[in-house]
Structures are given as C-alpha cells and as structure tokens.
C-alpha cells in the first residue's frame, strides 16, 4: 500500500475512533481508576493522535504495552506503529518512540 494512502487511512481511522470515544478527561479518569483499562488507553491514544498530539499518544500506548503487551493481540503495539506514519513530519519524535518500543519489546 502506498505510504501516503496508508497515512491518510490511519488518520481517518484515528478520527473515527476519537469521534466514537468518550472525551479525553473521562478516559484519563478511567485509566487513573484502573491502570489496566487498555480499552480506555487505546481510545485516549486515538483522541490524542487525531489532535496531532503524538507524544502523549505514544506515551499512552507504551504504558499499555508495559502493563500487558499481549492484550488484544498486541493492539497497543500495532496502533503505535500505525501512528508512527501519522507523525512522520516529526522524525526525531518517531525515532525516540520507535527506540522506546523496541527496548520495551526486547
């Protein structure tokens, strides 16, 4: 698949998920109450990514991976890799979080 097409498709999916998710404050409250709430973490990352807030989105996904990397067939890891394409205009940020992800998985 063409890289630009993939980037646009990922952005649309993030926006759709963000539109169907509770607000960020409610998601953060849910995560604070239950740190293992991976579903809320995934939704929060989508909300943040849809707003081009990639660093907090990546951090949210890394935290989910730290808690349980296998959850939902590694959904957080897969989502993080997808969001790297959205943040391609911030190569240093992507490099840091790719490295952090690699370190966490190895």
Can you say where each PLM-predicted feature lies in the sequence?
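Structural motif corresponding to the intra-repeat A-B loop/turn of tetratricopeptide repeats
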Residues: 16-18, 51, 87
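Alpha-helical adaptor scaffolds
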Residues: 1-34
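Short coil turns that delineate tetratricopeptide repeat
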Residues: 35-36, 52, 69-71
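Structural register within alpha-helical repeat arrays
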Residues: 9-11, 44, 80, 101
């Amino acid at each position: 698949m063409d890289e630009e097409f993939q980037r646009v498709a990922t952005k649309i999916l993030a926006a759709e998920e963000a539109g169907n998710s509770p607000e960020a404050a409610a998601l953060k409250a849910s995560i604070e109450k239950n740190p293992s709430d991976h579903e809320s973490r995934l939704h929060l990352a989508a909300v943040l990514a849809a707003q081009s807030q990639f660093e907090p989105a990546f951090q949210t996904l890394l935290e989910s991976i730290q808690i349980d990397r296998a959850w939902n067939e590694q959904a957080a890891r897969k989502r993080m890799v997808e969001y790297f394409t959205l943040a391609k205009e911030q190569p240093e940020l992507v490099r840091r979080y790719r490295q952090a992800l690699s370190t966490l998985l190895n």
